[in-house]
A protein has these predicted regions:
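Helix-loop-helix
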Residues: 1-279
Length: 279
């Protein structure tokens, strides 16, 4: 058993087993597990949202700074670092939730593999304490009794698109996961005030006009906002339905959490962004 299995897969496996022992439905267990994960990550996610808010707030100042030092790239870089410090923004801090989510998603995939193709290994991954739960102990002894369906109608070990055809319920989950990813990205994306396309900026650069880095970044972010959901959709249709369900619930909760904070805690975010500016 690899270190990843010990550190990531086994805890996820046993948490799911514990939930399954209470509600013997794989889909419902994944939903409850995802809710637990999202709320455990909520403090980090909220900080990420604060970062996005501060980024938006500093955009006008950043634009002025870039115009001021347009002929001195070294001075511009130093000034930009000072500006990030002023607003207490860490360029990579906003990626923290995503980086934590990635091993969890891989862990869920491994757990689905175990339940779908290696049920004889259930005992190998189950903690002794968890195996003492009667439902779990019976499942370890009788692996074929595992209910891999969601609400009794959808096999979550299947793929949305396979050689056997299309599983429309799982395809719907893949679409919803991509949709919520898009909506969440739009919530935190910097406000774009330019209608220019990347090709327009590149064409201007060829003519000798210096590209506005903030403008380029905004254009690239806009492209990524559209590309990532499409990429996620194609990934989800190639993986077991349990992963599509996990990502749908996870992205859906993230969208609702962001919406709640942006609507009800706008004053709090403004205060935090302003306090970051004063530091």
């Amino acid at each position: 058993m690899s270190l990843f299995d010990v550190v990531i897969v086994k805890p996820i496996f046993n948490l799911l087993m514990g939930i399954y022992s209470l509600i013997p439905d794989f889909g419902v267990s994944i939903i409850i597990f995802t809710v637990i994960v999202r709320f455990a990550l909520w403090p980090l996610a909220k900080k990420q949202l604060h970062q996005a808010k501060a980024m938006r707030k500093m955009q006008p100042e950043l634009k002025k700074l870039q115009a001021k030092y347009k002929d001195n790239k070294q001075a511009q870089s130093i000034a930009m670092l000072d500006l990030y410090k002023k607003y207490n923004i860490g360029p990579f801090r906003s990626m923290l939730v995503m980086l934590i989510q990635l091993p969890i998603m891989i862990g869920v995939y491994r757990v689905v593999q175990i339940f779908a193709m290696h049920r004889e290994e259930l005992g190998k991954y189950t903690y002794d304490l968890v195996e003492k739960i009667p439902t779990v102990g019976n499942l370890v002894q009788n692996p074929d009794s595992f209910n891999q369906n969601f609400l009794g109608i959808m096999d979550l070990t299947k793929h949305a698109v396979s050689e056997n055809g299309i599983t429309f319920g799982i395809l719907l989950f893949a679409l919803l996961a991509a949709l919520f990813q898009y909506l969440t990205s739009k919530q935190t994306a910097p406000n774009a005030k330019s209608d220019k396309r990347l090709r327009d900026v590149l064409a201007e650069a060829e003519q000798g006009k210096e590209a506005d880095q903030a403008e380029v970044n905004a254009i690239v972010m806009g492209k990524m906002t559209k590309f990532m959901p499409a990429f996620l959709f194609f990934i989800m249709i190639s993986l077991p339905g349990a992963l599509a369900l996990y990502m749908t619930v996870s992205n859906g909760i993230a969208y609702l959490q962001n919406r709640l904070v942006m609507q009800q805690d706008e004053d709090e975010l403004e205060d935090i962004a302003n306090s970051n500016k004063q530091k």
